[in-house]
């Protein structure tokens, strides 16, 4: 089943990420400072945690870790100046 407003939720979350970066948020400063190594390491950690939760059959933990993973994927999009709308267009092209 489709979640109504999912693109809106993603866009709002992305705007919050942009705001946090401009507001000098400590977590965002840590993830976005210098090279992308810290951000990629965090993304790798979230992927690993999601995989482990899935392997252990922990549905609630999979949901939590997947939310963290999506969040950090949005941070990575911001790092590369890619908007969620661009990503959604790319995903839309996968339906063809």
Predicted regions and their residues:
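Flexible "arm" and connector segments at domain edges
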Residues: 1-66, 70-96
């Amino acid at each position: 089943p489709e979640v109504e407003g999912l693109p809106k939720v993603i866009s709002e979350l992305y705007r919050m990420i942009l705001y946090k970066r401009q507001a000098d948020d400590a977590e965002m400063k840590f993830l976005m400072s210098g090279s992308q190594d810290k951000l990629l390491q965090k993304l790798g950690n979230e992927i690993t945690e999601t995989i482990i939760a899935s392997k252990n059959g922990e549905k609630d933990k999979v949901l939590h870790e997947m939310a963290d993973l999506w969040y950090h994927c949005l941070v990575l999009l911001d790092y590369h100046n890619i908007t969620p709308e661009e990503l959604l267009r790319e995903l839309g092209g996968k339906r063809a």
